[in-house]
Amino acid sequence: MRALIATVGSEGDVQPFLALGKRLLAEGHDVVFSASDSYTARADAVGVPFVGRPTWNETEFQANYLRIISEKNKLRQLTVVIEFLAQEQRSAVPQLMALAREADVVIHSPLSIGAVAAARAVGTPHVSVHHTWPLRRARGHGPTNVNLGPVGNALAWSITGSGIRLATDKLLNPVVAAAGLPPWRDILFDASHSRLLNLIAISPHALERDPLFGPTYRNTGYWFLDEPGYVPPDDLAAFVADEPPVVIGFGSNNGFDAHAVTKQLLDAVRGLDRRVVLQSGWAGLGDQELPPHVFLADFVPHGWLYARAACVVHHGGAGTTAAAFRAGIPQAIVWLQGDQLHWGRRIAQLGVGPPPRSQHALKAGWLRGALDSLLNNSDMAARARVLGTAIREEDGTGMAVRAIEKMFTAR
């Protein structure tokens, strides 16, 4: 089987797809991976054949991310995202069509509109992949996953769907047209779902399967990209060797006052009898003098760092949350946008962390209390360990490969 994998987004969006590509290759299939050419080195490092797209560099991505975060109106925020996405996806269509013609299946993220258009234009079946619950009209909940009752849910979906469609179809139909197809309606909903197979790359231990999803939706478990060859800097390895540290980092979150946030973080951990690894992230945390028990780090693979940590405070990205689940450590979420609040709430529901906090409301006092729970609540720690054991026993990429193979042979 020849698979084309296409995705968009940041490092956290790309890594799970690289994990799937690596597993497909190990199972004897052919793979071509298409994403921003800024990930060429990452793909080469794990041995996944890669065709880069000249889309954006990290500086451009961060600039657009800041535009998104600065928008207070949620519909306008979505429009900014789609404007950015549509430009990139339209330019990618010729490459994606050429690759899709040579593929037996196209595997894509929900926002890879160009890949879906290319697949449908050339007649190649496509499989959608989700790292949080797919956005779909369901009777059991409204657009924000709150159950408003059958009538309320239907009304909320109608209003929300109309607003999204009016704001985004006009921006995304040029992507569809670039593939030689007539205009689509409701593109964001339509392109993010496959009529054949939709893989939900989440552990059922972390989030139970929605009973309203039909047989074309498969909950596979998480897809982790292990990096056994990672060698940490000597000073970091020595810092974490004596005792498991607290890890604090907000990943690709940006658009807040990093200096002020760093001050709040340092105030919270000043008297803490525990070492702290502070990850600078895209925002550039740690831009001031740090006490001896705080180590400033840049990128460190979650699999390596979290396995050595006591707990983690992070932004609530789906991939970061999954990595902390897998490590079996308590976690607290300081959220900013997207599905981060959802994951923060889910962590609290599972009892492996305190209720989430908004980035804009982050104060040292709250963080001190959160760290006290993370470090000293034995029941919370026990639940996190049990969850971690269950997730480590799963084979998410293996289940995904088997589901794709079954779909392919059944056609």
Q: Predicted regions span which residues?
A:
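Nucleotide-activated sugar donor-binding and catalytic core shared by glycosyltransferases
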Residues: 1-11, 15-32, 38-49, 80, ...
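Generic beta-sheet signal
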Residues: 34-36, 53, 109, 129-132, ...
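Short, polar loop motifs at secondary-structure junctions
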Residues: 34-40, 110-114, 203-207, 280-286
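Short gly/pro/ser/thr-enriched loop/turn and capping motifs at secondary-structure boundaries
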Residues: 39-41, 57-61, 128, 133-139, ...
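A short helix->loop->beta-strand "cap" motif at the edges of active sites that frequently abuts
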Residues: 48, 122-125, 274, 329
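Phosphate/nucleotide-donor binding subsite
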Residues: 49-103, 158, 172
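Conserved nucleotide-sugar donor-interacting segment of glycosyltransferase catalytic cores
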Residues: 87-156, 205
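Donor-nucleotide binding loops and adjacent catalytic segments primarily
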Residues: 205-311
